[in-house]
C-alpha cells in the first residue's frame, strides 16, 4: 500500500471535484502501515483533486516560473523572518547544488526548489514566493541543512516544528523522490480539513498526514 523584500502574492485557488465523497482512513503503527507513525490516508483527495485559478496574473506568474532556474532569488530577503538552527543530513554526491532541483509540472504541484550559493530556496510554484531558505553545507557524501529562514504563519507561529518538518518533507519527496508522510497542525481535527490543508500546502505530492514529527520516519520494506 501505499535582493529585495517581495510583497506576498496570494494564491486564489479554486478546487474542482470539491463536492465528491472521499474516504479517509487512519492507520495505526502496524502491519498495514509502512511507517513508524500513525497516519491518515488522504490519497482519495490529494490524488484526484484539481486546482486552478481564475486570476490571470496568478496563472501568468505560474507560467513565468516554469522558465526560471532560480538565479533571480539570490540575495532575496524573507520579510519579518525568523531562523531555526537544525541538522538535517541527506545523501549527496558532493557536487555543487545549483539551479533547479525540482520544478512543478502543473498547478497541482505547489512547490519549486532551487539551489544557489549554499542556500536552497523552497518557493511556491504559483507565485514564486520564497517560503523557506535552507542554508546548507555540502560534503563529498551528503549535504546538511544547518539553518532555516522563514516567515511565521498562523500555524508555525505556535509550532516551529512545522517549519522543520515541512522542509524535510519537501526535500525527501520532491528532491529525493520518496513517498513520505507529512506533519499537519494538531489544531486540525476534522479529516477533510486535514486533506484540504495538505492539498493547499503540497498539492498532489502528499499522501499520508500525521500529527507526529517525521524527522525519524522509518519505512518498512515488505
Predicted regions mapped to residue ranges:
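Polybasic, proline/glycine-rich intrinsically disordered low-complexity segments
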Residues: 142-222
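Negatively charged, low-complexity tracts enriched in Asp/Glu with abundant Ser/Thr
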Residues: 32-117, 196, 201, 205-222
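Generic structural motif
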Residues: 45, 55, 118, 127, ...
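A structural signal for the main folded, soluble domain(s) of proteins
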Residues: 2-7, 92-95, 100-102, 115-117, ...
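Canonical SH2 domain fold
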Residues: 119-139, 147-150
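Non-catalytic accessory regions used for complex assembly or targeting
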Residues: 1-52
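A broad structural signal for short, well-ordered beta-strand segments within beta-sheet-rich domains
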Residues: 83, 108-111, 131, 143-147
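Generic structural hydrophobic/aromatic packing signal, biased to beta-strands
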Residues: 24-26, 37-42, 113, 134, ...
Amino acid at each position: 500500500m501505499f535582493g529585495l523584500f517581495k510583497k506576498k502574492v496570494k494564491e486564489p485557488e479554486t478546487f474542482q471535484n470539491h463536492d465528491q465523497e472521499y474516504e479517509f482512513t487512519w492507520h495505526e503503527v502496524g502491519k498495514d502501515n509502512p511507517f513508524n507513525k500513525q497516519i491518515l490516508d488522504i490519497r482519495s483527495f490529494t490524488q484526484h483533486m484539481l486546482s486552478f485559478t481564475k486570476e490571470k496574473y496568478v496563472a501568468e506568474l505560474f507560467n513565468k516560473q516554469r522558465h526560471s532556474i532560480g538565479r533571480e532569488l539570490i540575495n532575496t530577503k524573507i520579510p519579518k523572518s525568523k531562523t531555526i538552527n537544525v541538522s538535517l543530513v541527506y545523501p549527496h554526491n558532493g557536487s555543487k547544488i545549483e539551479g533547479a532541483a525540482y520544478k512543478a509540472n502543473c498547478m497541482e504541484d505547489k512547490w519549486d526548489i532551487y539551489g544557489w550559493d549554499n542556500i536552497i530556496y523552497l518557493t511556491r510554484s504559483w507565485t514564486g514566493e520564497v517560503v523557506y531558505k535552507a542554508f546548507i553545507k555540502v560534503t563529498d557524501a551528503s549535504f546538511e541543512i544547518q539553518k532555516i529562514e522563514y516567515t511565521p504563519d498562523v500555524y508555525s507561529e505556535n509550532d516551529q516544528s512545522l517549519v522543520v518538518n515541512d522542509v524535510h518533507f519537501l526535500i525527501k519527496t520532491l528532491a529525493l523522490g520518496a513517498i513520505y508522510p507529512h506533519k499537519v497542525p494538531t489544531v486540525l481535527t476534522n479529516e477533510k480539513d486535514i486533506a484540504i490543508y495538505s492539498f493547499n500546502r503540497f498539492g498532489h505530492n502528499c499522501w499520508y498526514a500525521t500529527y507526529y514529527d517525521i524527522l525519524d520516519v522509518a519505512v518498512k520494506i515488505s
